[in-house]
Amino acid sequence: MLKARFIKHTLQFKQASGTSRGVLKTKDSWFLILCDTDNPNTQGIGECSIIEGLSPDNLEEYESKLQFVCENINQKEQLLIALSKFPSIQFGLETALLDIQANGSKNLFRSHFVRSNSPIKINGLIWMGNKDFMLEQIKTKIELGFSCLKLKI
């Protein structure tokens, strides 16, 4: 049997980051933490994270939906269906369940990326800013070996 809880964590950006919806300095995330009562030392953790205005999840109902997940954690199939309008919570739940299956190792899938601990150098993100700031980011990402850059403009 599983038990669940969640905690909220506010990420503090190292630098203000421009998006099409404005400048981000902080971002809230919630961590869904599962524990198997048969193996209480093993935790599965999944991150539920949104960017307000860009994510379809309803922020006003977010924590009550997370509480609903915690109260109904042993009805996995029904939960996944009930979360259709909260894809970020659904993702966090699926991740936490996979982590429990992986004995809390955080190695959810066997892959070269996981085994070699090397980054996947695609989609280097370039944050919005003035021309010089963006050009410096582009130069750095290319030097790091990224083959595709995503510019926030």
Regions found by a protein language model. Give the residues of each.
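N-terminal capping/lid subdomain adjacent to the active-site entrance of alpha/beta enzymes
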Residues: 1-153
